Amino acid sequence: MSRYDLVERLNGTFRQIEQHLAALTDNLQQHSLLIARVFSLPQVTKEAEHAPLDTIEVTQHLGKEAEALALRHYRHLFIQQQSENRSSKAAVRLPGVLCYQVDNATQLDLENQIQRINQLKTTFEQMVTVESGLPSAARFEWVHRHLPGLITLNAYRTLTLINNPATIRFGWANKHIIKNLSRDEVLSQLKKSLASPRSVPPWTREQWQFKLEREYQDIAALPQQARLKIKRPVKVQPIARIWYKGQQKQVQHACPTPIIALINTDNGAGVPDIGGLENYDADNIQHRFKPQAQPLRLIIPRLHLYVAD
């Protein structure tokens, strides 16, 4: 497929996402809102976009106010829709839930509508990350040449739909991106970097090359069977824990955007019990279960690369 055809498909798919999101928000407003609870988080400024989040103060919104915030959030796709001071790199998150009363027919209609939106979002992400054939650093420029100001993460984010929950509880999750690597895989990556000399502020080209050579030597000195692990921290994430009484099971969802809960009164479902979201405080985290961590030694800090001792 030619680059021109891909751009045409990219623009066409994005227009469909916008149209279907507009139709969904109109459709939801035609349904009876049983309960709504969302939690706005402080905006991240451009100056603080890389700073660690040690505390997060939560503001609760209820009812129609919560619904209005949520429906606007679903369609928040461009930086032009937000404050000039707000970071365009930090994700805009609005955890919470909207609960709507449905019958069998309207439940199926909304399920199909949301499934279609999620399919389009997945297709759009595939075009950008795979079909474009571009490295991650070049994708930003390519996408924004055709869709100026697009917040790609918001375009990729799918909507979470649940049916007839009994209880919904919110909380925070601290996670790491973990990837296991062999010594030879890391050496191969470093070789590629060494073969393409460049400067990386605050280092000059020569200083960066020397730094890479030292890293290569450190990895090469390890036994071939050494167990290496990238363990990169991810900023704390809001989550929702959903309890289904009939199935007697709990399901956990990431909750960067309000969940849509359909309550089917034809089947006798009732309004769920919805909890709040506490302020986040990194110094006061209580772990339900924290397994014994494997002893790791940091070997390349910039890559968050560790070796198992």
UniProtKB/Swiss-Prot annotation:
Which GO cellular component term is one of those annotated? cytoplasm
Q: Which InterPro entries match?
A: DNA_replication_term_site-bd (IPR008865), Tus_dom1 (IPR036381), Tus_sf (IPR036384)
Q: Its Gene Ontology biological processes?
A: DNA replication termination
Q: Which GO terms describe its molecular function?
A: DNA binding
Alphabetic keyword roster: Cytoplasm, DNA replication, DNA-binding
Where does the record place it?
Answer: Cytoplasm
Signal peptide region: none
Q: Does the keyword Cytoplasm apply?
A: yes
Q: What does the record give as the function of this protein?
A: Trans-acting protein required for termination of DNA replication. Binds to DNA replication terminator sequences (terA to terF) to prevent the passage of replication forks. The termination efficiency will be affected by the affinity of this protein for the terminator sequence.
Give the record's family classification: Belongs to the Tus family.
The name this protein carries in UniProt is DNA replication terminus site-binding protein
Name of the gene encoding the protein in the UniProt record: tus
